[in-house]
């Protein structure tokens, strides 16, 4: 339970997105199940969420073929005091998150975290919760672009070079007021919209989102070259 400066306690639900297929990795199993310090990669974020005093409930999303494994894993780790649901993922990340949202009956704030992003820090959660208020519907972690970005056409011809000072590379966690997030996903379902992150959907319903500057080491394990960060 999170208490803001007004001392109003808010219930916080943490969604761990662990249903990715990891196609770009060319591995025998999804990247979130890679070994990291003797545990599956997803456990790094799951453990932090379980131990964070501000988080009340946890929902884990995983692939259909890994549902039984995830249940047994959480049983062995005694995590079901906080883990309320283990949900089957959809064909796209957005559909997976919506599957989890539909399980939530009573909460105020939702935190969404990629299971393949193992370097989650408590400070990201604390800072995100602090800035959610009447004027802010969501908080997302990100870092400034260090490289110049080019916009190209389908033939690889450069069309434009945006000012990188205005560009942010977005990470997770992404934190939202629950009702706003739910409304955004409902809108996406009704209009058949598919976005690459939850913040994009909240933006589409005019939600106000603030950036919290994170760290460059908060990477998502996505391609083979990223495996060196796990050593």
Swiss-Prot record:
Record carries keyword Kinase: no
One Pfam family of this chain: IspD
Catalytic activity field: 2-C-methyl-D-erythritol 4-phosphate + CTP + H(+) = 4-CDP-2-C-methyl-D-erythritol + diphosphate
Annotated site location: Positions MEP for the nucleophilic attack: 164, 220
Signal peptide start and end residues: none
Membrane-traversing stretches: none
Top-level taxon of origin: Bacteria
Any one biological process term the GO annotation gives: isopentenyl diphosphate biosynthetic process, methylerythritol 4-phosphate pathway
Annotated pathway: Isoprenoid biosynthesis; isopentenyl diphosphate biosynthesis via DXP pathway; isopentenyl diphosphate from 1-deoxy-D-xylulose 5-phosphate: step 2/6
Enzyme Commission number(s) from the entry: 2.7.7.60
UniProt keyword list: Isoprene biosynthesis, Nucleotidyltransferase, Transferase
Family of this protein: Belongs to the IspD/TarI cytidylyltransferase family. IspD subfamily.
PANTHER family for the chain: 2-C-METHYL-D-ERYTHRITOL 4-PHOSPHATE CYTIDYLYLTRANSFERASE, CHLOROPLASTIC (PTHR32125:SF4)
Protein name listed in UniProt: 2-C-methyl-D-erythritol 4-phosphate cytidylyltransferase
Organism per entry: Fusobacterium nucleatum subsp. nucleatum (strain ATCC 25586 / DSM 15643 / BCRC 10681 / CIP 101130 / JCM 8532 / KCTC 2640 / LMG 13131 / VPI 4355)
